[in-house]
Amino acid sequence: MPMERFLKDFTIPEKIEFLKSQDDGSYGKFTIYPFERGFGVTIGNTLRRVLLSSIEGYAITAMRVQSNNKDSSSKVVSSEFDLIPGVSEDTLEVIANIKNIHLKLREGEQRKTISFSVSGKDTNVLKASHFERDGVEVFNKDLVIATLSHDVNLDFEFQINYGRGYVSSEQNSKYLEEVNVIALDSIFSPIEKVSYSVEDTRVGQRSDYDKLVMEIWTTGVISAKDAIKKAASIVREFLFPLVDFEDSVSVSFDKSKSESSNLLDMSIEKLDLSVRSLNCLAKENVRTLGELISKNAEELSKARNFGKKSLEEIIEKLGSYQLFLGMSKEDALSVLSKNVKISE
C-alpha cells in the first residue's frame, strides 16, 4: 500500500493548544489532539525521554579558587576536599551549589572562562548573580553559593561549556592542563521536569481518540516552547532514515557527499583539543573544522598566547584525518568524502 494512502487512513493531530504561565517561558502546557488510540502514549513518552536526555545547555565544568591573605600570602584550593579559607561551607557544598546555577552564554558561544574577585568587606554572601558577566546570563541570580567571613578575599575562575546530558568530573578533568583546577560534574540539561497524560477526545461520532497533554518546566535557559520544538526535531532526524530505507544504496552515496560537506561545519571541540588550544582558537573566531583548515601555521602562530605546543597538537589532530592547515576546501571535501566516518 502506498505510504500516502496508508497515512490517509490515520487521524493526524490538527490542533495544538499552548498555555504559558511564566513570563520567561520556562513553563508550558501543550495539548495536542486528536491521535489514534495508543499514539498519545507513544508520542508523549518519546518526547518526554528526549526532552529529559537530549536538550543541550550550559554548565560550569571546572573552577579555580585562590584565597589572598592580609600578609600578601595566598592559598589555592587544590581539590574538592580542601577547605576554602573564610568560607563557612565546605568545598563539596559550594560545588553542589555551583552546579545549580542556571546560565547561558552569548548566542553562538560554546565555551567561556570567567574570572572575578570577591571580598568579605563588600558582601558576606557569594550569589549566582556574581557569575553574570559580559556574555554570561544567569537566571537564578539569588541562589546562595557560599557564606563569606568579613576578612576574606577570594579570586575565582570558572570554565563554562556547552553540552548535553551528564558529564562526570573524571571526563572533564581530561581537558584540564593547569594544576589546582578542580573539575566538576556537569549537568547540561536545561529541562527540570516533564510530565504527560493522555485523555479521551471526540472526533465525529467516535470518542476513543487520544488527547496528549504535556507539561514542561525549564530552568529558563530555553523556553518550554523551544524545548518541545527541539525534541520533535531530534525525533524526526532519527526516524527520517527509516522512511526510504529501501533506497539504501543511493541514500548512502548521497550521504557520503553531503556528510563530507557538513563535516567542515563541525565544531572544533569534536577534535578533542586541549582547553588552551580551544580558547586560543575561539579568540581568533575559529569555531569549525572548515575555518581551522583555512588558516595557515603562520597566521595561528601570530595569535596571542598561541604557542608551539598548541600548533603541534592541531597539526597532529588534523593529520589523523588526513587534513592540514592551509588546505583548500575542495581538497578537504575530497579527503572527507572518502573518510566520512570521522563524524561518527
UniProtKB/Swiss-Prot annotation:
Catalytic activity, EC: 2.7.7.6
GO MF annotation list: DNA binding; DNA-directed RNA polymerase activity; protein dimerization activity
Bridged cysteine pairs (disulfide): none
Annotated GO CC locations: cytoplasm; DNA-directed RNA polymerase complex
Catalytic reactions on record: RNA(n) + a ribonucleoside 5'-triphosphate = RNA(n+1) + diphosphate
InterPro entries per record: DNA-dir_RNA_pol_insert (IPR011262), DNA-dir_RNA_pol_RpoA/D/Rpb3 (IPR011263), DNA-dir_RpoA (IPR011773), RBP11-like (IPR036603), RNAP_asu_C (IPR011260), RNApol_insert_sf (IPR036643)
Ranges where the record places region Alpha C-terminal domain (alpha-CTD): 259-344
Any one of the GO BP annotations: DNA-templated transcription
Domain observations: The N-terminal domain is essential for RNAP assembly and basal transcription, whereas the C-terminal domain is involved in interaction with transcriptional regulators and with upstream promoter elements.
General function of this protein: DNA-dependent RNA polymerase catalyzes the transcription of DNA into RNA using the four ribonucleoside triphosphates as substrates.
Subunit relationships: Homodimer. The RNAP catalytic core consists of 2 alpha, 1 beta, 1 beta' and 1 omega subunit. When a sigma factor is associated with the core the holoenzyme is formed, which can initiate transcription.
Name of the protein in question: DNA-directed RNA polymerase subunit alpha
Source species taxonomy: Bacteria, Pseudomonadati, Spirochaetota, Spirochaetia, Spirochaetales
Gene: rpoA
